[in-house]
């Protein structure tokens, strides 16, 4: 079975001949008209549709969803959107959403995206629903988690690989620079994704440019004149792109762990890998304070020690209790996902010690969590969706540029170096049915935007702190600096300081004072 081989595995679940012919999705345009106004004409039926909420159980797509969505405190709905906004009379999709009703006097809806791309907002809000329902945000807002087009319970849904193929290591590996050997492999990837996801027109519709248009439809159908929004990680990019397209429709926008708007996609890749290397070094230094650290007591030699543990898996996976085995790619996904938060370091140390002793069960569990694998062996579709969304968002590199990026990443993050030669590879989206539709740069400074709030963590490995500074500047909004070493913090119940300031902003539109700082 075909497999996209990874030159460099970096992110867990987390990225020629065209397949058929379809019209390119229209680039989004800034809308005119009064705040909250629905467009006249062909799109009016989407903006004017009535949302029918119902029990959430039928919306579950994973074992975890089945458990969470059985809670009768939540209700769910689907909202119709055009696959192609330039052809509203053509095929349609449905965006699924989950609601936690406000328990007090309601301001409106708070739309939430947890990142990814490919993350399920429904699952995220269901997980945090009890926490938010008990706090000030849950008192004043209907909290709405939505699955962006292509994700989770929304339809059509990105589907490139089966659960069985992921179990055999034949699906997307989580590689930042997938090693696609030639044009034929690129065509095979695009063809199987199109076949499983509703065809080439659907596959070309999954970009962020369409998602922000869907968000405006959601705003209107939920009855909100203006949008209140919480976006984390990739969700900050969605928020900023929405603000650029619909500045007059923004009420409040809290953006946590920001994608840097000043960097090209390649520059961001390198900044991110530099951030992971710094996180690895912080972890190694912490681990080295213990005499039984599996990477040794000299942090300077931690990269060498890690490679000595991980590289043998390139040839011989470590045994695991379920018989799947732990591969090199699995270890890298477990490692990088555990570097997202310092709270995961003890489990990472346990897993590396176990691996050094010849077993891979602990790290396999971390890998499964990162890849969205449930205890029943079913995977969510976050990996497939991330791949498809990036293909419609990011510029496509030439083989020479792709190969050079792989070399640069090895230099930026040596702990990820497999030791194998970097070979020339083609861009994984080379044969996608349409070119990317997200403008570059994707935000330049919306006109008429109300105050926004960007939260940025000083030791964030995945979205470096400087990105938050830059996004706050471009949006003309406020910055909240958080001293810590993790990715994502707003309204997660981990910092009273952060949660209080974010809640004050969302509820009362009160931004923190200049230079405001909190501790994770």
Where are the language model's segments positioned?
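Secretory targeting and sorting signals
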Residues: 1-27, 79, 215
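Long, low-complexity segments enriched in small/aliphatic residues
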Residues: 361-394, 398-402
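Helix-loop "lid/cap" segments that line or gate small-molecule binding pockets
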Residues: 337-338, 392
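Short, solvent-exposed helix-helix connector turns and helix-capping sites enriched
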Residues: 290, 355-363, 495
